[in-house]
Amino acid sequence: MNKETKLQVEAIKNGTVIDHIPAQVGIKVLKLFDMHNSSQRVTIGLNLPSSALGNKDLLKIENVFINEEQASKLALYAPHATVNQIEDYQVVKKLALELPEFVSDVFECPNTNCITHNEPVASNFRVFEKKGDVRLKCKYCEKVFSREIVTER
């Protein structure tokens, strides 16, 4: 018996589709863009089967378009995700994700002795890759952290 199974997630007319998000990261992306407070319809797929990743997360946000700056922030969480802008059910633009050089006022410095915890200054990190791993260096305490440690906060 040959059984063919197909996962179907409803298409959106206009908006953004973020695909190939690593499993367990989709909720963090929702919070990063404050989508969980949006009045627009958001379709969330968690732990979906993926031939490339094993499992993946997927987000479809109707009537919301992610800009280049937001795509750079997304790259910190999901550097290999794909971002498609949809208009009238068609992909009209694909955003390439690139790590930003700097990221400000997005994450809290994990170093509890950092000045950002006691003074009214925005956090600021330099972003770089080392041996394929994304690292963030705090502008103030100059400590270097892995992406996973910083984005968990």
Swiss-Prot record:
Q: Does the keyword Zinc apply?
A: yes
Q: Which InterPro entries match?
A: Asp_carbamoyltransf_reg_N (IPR020545), Asp_carbamoylTrfase_reg (IPR002801), Asp_carbamoyltrfase_reg_C (IPR020542), Asp_carbatrfase_reg_C_sf (IPR036792), Asp_carbatrfase_reg_N_sf (IPR036793)
Give an example GO biological process.
'de novo' pyrimidine nucleobase biosynthetic process
Is Metal-binding set as a keyword in this record? yes
Q: What positions does the entry give for Zn(2+) binding?
A: C109, C114, C138, C141
Q: What cofactors does the UniProt entry give for this protein?
A: Zn(2+)
Alphabetic keyword roster = Metal-binding, Pyrimidine biosynthesis, Zinc
Q: Which Pfam families match?
A: PyrI, PyrI_C
Which cellular component terms (GO) are annotated to the entry?
aspartate carbamoyltransferase complex
Q: How is the cofactor bound?
A: Binds 1 zinc ion per subunit.
Q: Which superkingdom heads the taxonomic lineage of this protein's source? A: Bacteria
Q: Which GO terms describe its molecular function?
A: metal ion binding
| Function of the protein | Involved in allosteric regulation of aspartate carbamoyltransferase.
Family named by the database record: Belongs to the PyrI family.
Q: Quaternary arrangement and interactors, per the entry? A: Contains catalytic and regulatory chains.
- Please give the PANTHER family that the UniProt record associates with this protein: ASPARTATE CARBAMOYLTRANSFERASE REGULATORY CHAIN
NCBIfam families in the cross-refs:
ATCase_reg
Q: What is this protein called?
A: Aspartate carbamoyltransferase regulatory chain
- Species of provenance: Vibrio vulnificus (strain CMCP6)
> Which gene specifies this protein's sequence?
pyrI
